[in-house]
């Protein structure tokens, strides 16, 4: 189903670029995703209900999403017609990936054993942007005492691990190779 969501996201992304609505659509899609992320199971029930017609699913869209961008509403209608309303979170993720790629930015999760100061965060973000060649890094921080010390950064599938725990694991592997 991820491939299906990617197609919807790509179509919406292309339309948003063509109509100079990329920022507006991204903002509205973010709000919609937040609103429905805990309701995916109910949306799956709507999708799989054989007695509900496409028109009834469209009425649901109209009732829930009153003042949304017409391009998003049209995409929601297509999702409803094809019994894919429950894919909205996957569509959002795929759209967000396209959006981030367009602006050469990505999300980064920075884990450390304590709350980092703004100066420390700025240094880590600078390091991450240099390592990943991204223009912008959107940061989420987490405290992880298992790291023992240092920090670990996850950007997409890339992990930059400067933690004491990682150093100990690497040292342990070297000792195993020697023995």
Curated annotation (Swiss-Prot):
It is a peripheral membrane protein. One of its GO terms (molecular function) is proton-transporting ATP synthase activity, rotational mechanism. Coiled coil: none annotated. Keywords: ATP synthesis, Cell membrane, CF(1), Hydrogen ion transport, Ion transport, Membrane, Transport. InterPro entries: ATP_synth_OSCP/delta_N_sf, ATPase_OSCP/d_CS, ATPase_OSCP/dsu. GO terms for cellular component: plasma membrane; proton-transporting ATP synthase complex. The keyword Membrane applies. SUPFAM superfamilies: N-terminal domain of the delta subunit of the F1F0-ATP synthase (SSF47928). It is found in: Cell membrane. F(1)F(0) ATP synthase produces ATP from ADP in the presence of a proton or sodium gradient. F-type ATPases consist of two structural domains, F(1) containing the extramembraneous catalytic core and F(0) containing the membrane proton channel, linked together by a central stalk and a peripheral stalk. During catalysis, ATP synthesis in the catalytic domain of F(1) is coupled via a rotary mechanism of the central stalk subunits to proton translocation. This protein is part of the stalk that links CF(0) to CF(1). It either transmits conformational changes from CF(0) to CF(1) or is implicated in proton conduction. Belongs to the ATPase delta chain family. F-type ATPases have 2 components, F(1) - the catalytic core - and F(0) - the membrane proton channel. F(1) has five subunits: alpha(3), beta(3), gamma(1), delta(1), epsilon(1). F(0) has three main subunits: a(1), b(2) and c(10-14). The alpha and beta chains form an alternating ring which encloses part of the gamma chain. F(1) is attached to F(0) by a central stalk formed by the gamma and epsilon chains, while a peripheral stalk is formed by the delta and b chains. This is ATP synthase subunit delta.
